[in-house]
């Protein structure tokens, strides 16, 4: 084992020791009992559900709900950054959710107004049709 490997091993041991010390501390128990931990943890259900929906038919995607979730997560990312102390778990949860919901939004737009709908109608025609008949859940052919 050379000198750099010994140094990196000592650094890893030091980080591990500090982490274990923190796990045993009253501060960690206080964190586990706070909404700073449980709120974001329970919030991770939303992006997990969105990931599971990535393989489903794009007809099932609600454009309004996807847009609302993108906006909601963007607002709460800002909140998680500005609150004191900063809530990095909440920030990560909402950054993850914004990313996944944006992917769902892209699938929605591509299906209803873009690539998949381009062969039948122009994007403009699809948008105008959706504006005239927002309650119709299927594309007119």
UniProtKB/Swiss-Prot annotation:
Q: Which residues cross the membrane?
A: 31-52, 60-82
The question of whether Transport is a record keyword is answered with: yes
Give the keywords, sorted: Membrane, Mitochondrion, Mitochondrion inner membrane, Transmembrane, Transmembrane helix, Transport
Gene for this chain: mpc1
Q: How does it sit in the membrane?
A: Multi-pass membrane protein
Subcellular localization(s) per the UniProt record? Mitochondrion; Mitochondrion inner membrane
Top-rank lineage group of the source organism: Eukaryota
Q: How does this chain assemble?
A: The functional 150 kDa pyruvate import complex is a heteromer of mpc1 and mpc2.
Principal location listed in the UniProt entry: mitochondrion
Picking any one GO biological process from the record gives: mitochondrial pyruvate transmembrane transport
A GO CC term? mitochondrial inner membrane
Q: Which GO MF terms are attached to this record? A: pyruvate transmembrane transporter activity
Describe the function of this protein. Answer: Mediates the uptake of pyruvate into mitochondria.
Q: What is this protein called?
A: Probable mitochondrial pyruvate carrier 1
Kinase among the record's keywords? no
Disulfide partners = none
Protein family per UniProt: Belongs to the mitochondrial pyruvate carrier (MPC) (TC 2.A.105) family.
Q: Which InterPro entries match?
A: MPC
């Amino acid at each position: 084992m050379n000198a750099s490997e010994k140094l990196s091993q000592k650094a890893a041991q030091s980080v591990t020791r500090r982490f274990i010390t923190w796990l045993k501390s009253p501060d960690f128990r206080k964190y586990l009992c706070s909404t700073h931990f449980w709120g974001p943890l329970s919030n991770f259900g939303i992006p997990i559900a969105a990931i599971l929906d990535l393989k489903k038919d794009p007809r099932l995607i609600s454009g309004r709900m996807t847009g609302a979730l993108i906006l909601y997560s963007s607002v709460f990312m800002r909140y998680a950054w500005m609150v004191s102390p900063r809530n990095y778990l909440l920030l990560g949860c909402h950054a993850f959710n914004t990313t996944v919901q944006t992917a769902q939004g892209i699938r929605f737009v591509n299906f209803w107004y873009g690539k998949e709908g381009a062969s039948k109608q122009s994007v403009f025609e699809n948008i105008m049709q959706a504006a005239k008949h927002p309650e119709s859940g299927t594309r007119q052919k």
